[in-house]
Amino acid sequence: MHSGTVTVVNDWALFGHPLFLQRLEDLIEEVEGLAEEDPDGFHHHAHYKLLEKVEEAILVRVPTNPAAPEYFQGKTLGKENGHWRRIKNGLPNRYRLFFQFRSDAPKSIIYAWLNDEATLRKDGSKTDVYAVFLAKLKRGEIPSSFAELERDAGPIPGHAG
């Protein structure tokens, strides 16, 4: 894991794969730009709302109980990827955020990937969020094992926006 200040919530250390951390940083920068352009109305923009929901999920909801049944993704990614969890509820429609966790010490949650407008949920589509995430796993762009994911991960900022 990369060094830096680690955010800990409910005894869970929070980390992100570089793809997630970059997506989060890009989203923050975009929202900051929106705030400069329209200080009174930026909070109505879809990307502000997405950032707000992602922050709530990664800093509040998931660290409350990352093993909650609502995060199970079933067999959508295949039997061999059943260890992956996904955040669906609480995010804008058709967005998913994938993560893994380990409850043995040190307790860690690693957020791996959040889809974008080009990869929204659409069952059967080549650009469906699950199809794209599975392709990233198969190409090794995102490691499937927790140990490899942990090796690549960096700390999640304590307050993203």
Which stretches of residues belong to each language-model region?
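Enriched for short, Lys/Arg-rich terminal
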Residues: M1-F15, E29, L77-G78, G82-G161
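N-terminal "first-domain core" detector
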Residues: M1-I58
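A structural signal for alpha-helix termini and helix-coil/disorder junctions
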Residues: D26, E30-G33, T64-A68, R139, ...
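Secondary-structure transition/capping residues
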Residues: V31, A35-D38, P69, Q73, ...
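A short, hydrophobic secondary-structure junction motif
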Residues: H47-T64, K136-S144
